Amino acid sequence: MFNTKIEFSKYDPELWKAIDQEKNRQENHIELIASENYTSNYVMHVQGSQLTNKYAEGYPEKRYYGGCKYVDIIEKLAINRAKKLFNADYANVQPHSGSQANFAVYTALLNPGDTILGMKLSHGGHLTHGSSVNFSGKTYNVIGYGVDKKGNIDYQEILTLAKKYKPKMIIGGFSAYSGICNWSKMRDIADEINAYFVVDIAHVAGLIAANLYPNPIDYAHVVTSTTHKTLAGPRGGLILAKNGTNTFYKKINLSVFPGAQGGPLMHVIAAKAIAFKEALEPAFKIYQKQVIKNAQVMVQSFLKKDYQIVSGNTFNHLFLLDLTSKNITGQEADIALGKCNITVNKNTIPNDLRSPFITSGIRIGTPAVTKRGFKENEMLQISDWIVHILNNIKDKNSLLGIKNEVLKLCSKYPVYI
């Protein structure tokens, strides 16, 4: 019925053109957005497979539809690999995204109006950790913690707020924090007030899988994650836990389905299974080590050039460049760098006086550039380019010259051959 040897460009040239343009953009831009990465061809291939046709509401061997024999095998592969990768004894691979994973966990453990304690978005947290524009901020009573004057998580503040407000849940994790989190200390605080401790590892899941960042699985009641970012898999979500009861795990499962979602995306779950397999291989740890090295090399380069780094260093894949003293907004930096084919995102910094649409900083991450083969020398060159652009932000000729250099570098390191 269907010819699998399709000529996409002829059938829908308008759509194909946009896809091809995006492919070229990825090849010709230096990608420094911390939450972006490049998946393998295996991951992309499986997402375009016949699995996209299959409905499989429920869980393996407990489906509401027939014909699930083979998708059961696929989902169990993904579950078992996820458990092995993160040293967990429970995994749910069905969440469509990290936000969906967080939503499912919150609704499983909380009631509307309950108090939660999460990291402020302006200090490095995530929308789903209590932002007023997100479901988490609209559904629950949110108390926010932040970082101290040195840019490190303020555990004393967490303890003080926990004792004062008695939240039902404390949320660990971040979207823009370059330090190491003390999961043990946060669990102790949660235990002191009899609260759930939930950790969102979306940004550092790949580093944790490679044993290069502390794993919260032995401390958190529940761990959530995305499967892209540092993990370099398909866009999707994941829920993990350890040392819980079957009743507890069933509660989370029911909150995912039927509580938050209907049918799982089996083509994406298969891609997750491949990504977990890739992350279990020795090459993955080598890659993650280089991700951290590349970020740290950039930090030191910026510091030597009199640029400020929030927290002063990085111990993971990202860092925040504080532009306050340079009289440049994050938005201006984002636009100027984009004109030179260097992609970052504007980002608020702790105690930022500018709006989230303007900001006083930019966030820089190294997962994608490391994936395409960049190492220390390339990162030093990129840091030099960024500084030159920001120091000469209105010099169009200078920016054009750097764009040409960026294109030359990108051509030496193709993403997809």
Curated annotation (Swiss-Prot):
Where is it predominantly found?
Answer: cytoplasm
Taxonomy, superkingdom:
Bacteria
PROSITE patterns cross-referenced by the UniProt entry: SHMT (PS00096)
Q: Which SUPFAM superfamilies match?
A: PLP-dependent transferases
Which reactions does this protein catalyse? (6R)-5,10-methylene-5,6,7,8-tetrahydrofolate + glycine + H2O = (6S)-5,6,7,8-tetrahydrofolate + L-serine
Name its co-factor(s). Answer: pyridoxal 5'-phosphate
N6-(pyridoxal phosphate)lysine-modified residues are where?
A: 229
Q: Which GO terms describe its cellular component?
A: cytosol
Q: What does this protein do?
A: Catalyzes the reversible interconversion of serine and glycine with tetrahydrofolate (THF) serving as the one-carbon carrier. This reaction serves as the major source of one-carbon groups required for the biosynthesis of purines, thymidylate, methionine, and other important biomolecules. Also exhibits THF-independent aldolase activity toward beta-hydroxyamino acids, producing glycine and aldehydes, via a retro-aldol mechanism.
Q: Please state what the protein is called.
A: Serine hydroxymethyltransferase
